Amino acid sequence: MSKKILIVDDEPDLLEMVQISLETEGYECIVAYDGFRALDRARKEKPDLIILDVMLPGLNGHKICRLLKFDEQYKHIPIIMLTAEAQEKDRLLGEETGADYYMTKPFAADKLIAKVAELLGK
């Protein structure tokens, strides 16, 4: 059974590129374009991993990460923060909220795929 990944980004082109890259590698992808839908999909779908933008309509990525990581039912789900927020303070905030990895845009798809595989133990 393929691993399920929730991709959350409000940029449709970027979200589609990430989705195609991961599906090509055999992952099942579900998507959300805003913070509230992301939290809802994470709770209902229980993905194996989440790729999460920081700047989102509704709830931002840091709030979503914090809510999931401090909930016993979801804290085991690895979260990759994928964002244009590239300053050191942003990366530290990502770590503080519980993100497992912080990757800045623009990024190389092969690097993202390698990190996904690493976090999923593949």
Task: Tell me what each language-model feature is.
Residues 16-24:
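Charged docking surfaces used in two-component/phosphorelay signaling
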Residues 107-117:
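C-terminal output helix
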Residues 45-51, 56:
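Active-site beta3 strand of CheY-like receiver
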Residues 26-33, 41:
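Short hydrophobic/Thr-rich beta-strand motif most characteristic of the beta2 strand and flanking loop
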Residues 15, 57, 66, 75, ...:
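The feature encodes the CheY-like receiver
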